[in-house]
Amino acid sequence: MHLLIAAAGSGRRMGATRNKLLLPLSGQPVLAWTLQAALEAESIHWIGIIGQEIDRSEILTLVEGAPKPVAWITGGDSRQESVSRGLAGLPDTAQHVLIHDGARCLASPHLFNRCSDAVRSGKAVIAATPVTDTIKRVDASGLITATPNRAELWAAQTPQAFSVDELRQGHREAHACGWTVTDDASLYERLGWPVNVLDAGPSNIKVTTPFDLTVAAAVLAERLG
């Protein structure tokens, strides 16, 4: 299985002046935990790291001596463009691909393997978790306009797993039509293609704020004993 890791994270919401994935977390950079899980996942045979050139040397230091092939792919100005470049950088033999946010540093090897198994069976899948809060739809003035049925709501996460040919087609359509999406599953939705959810459990958080770092450190402390 081929894995693309989006690693061009901004530090803006962290109050940091550098890539948040290079901030320390329990003794090593955030991204190192993501890479460790990917390298331990039996299903993953090739990893592409999509990042910005300014971070290239520091990120590649994290995978020196890695037991699997790891390639560097220079990203674009948006996540969508970066993933498109990542798809262009896949080996010719790639049939399926997992897309993963480097900031989801608590993803387990088992989660990568589950997503890999699902996409090999012919399903496009995304890691997700059922929403537990009551969600409100709110207009521009701050007025609540609706309360969606919580039973139908899931928070989309990564890894997201797809056919390489289909996902490339989705990105071509997005470019041609001017679509802007925040995850790759949205391209499938626009094209009317089915995507399934795979329950990732409660710990597959995305590290975005200082509070998220605190939560991630607590989860890692529990895992590591």
Swiss-Prot record:
Alphabetized PROSITE patterns for the sequence: ISPD
Catalyzed reactions: 2-C-methyl-D-erythritol 4-phosphate + CTP + H(+) = 4-CDP-2-C-methyl-D-erythritol + diphosphate
The EC number(s) this enzyme carries: 2.7.7.60
GO molecular function: 2-C-methyl-D-erythritol 4-phosphate cytidylyltransferase activity
Site for Positions MEP for the nucleophilic attack, residues: 150, 206
Annotated site residues (Transition state stabilizer) in this chain: 13, 20
Keywords: Isoprene biosynthesis, Nucleotidyltransferase, Transferase
InterPro entries the UniProt entry points to: IspD, IspD/TarI, IspD/TarI_cytidylyltransf_bact, ISPD_synthase_CS, Nucleotide-diphossugar_trans
Family: Belongs to the IspD/TarI cytidylyltransferase family. IspD subfamily.
Name by which UniProt lists this protein: 2-C-methyl-D-erythritol 4-phosphate cytidylyltransferase
Source organism of the structure: Synechococcus sp. (strain CC9311)
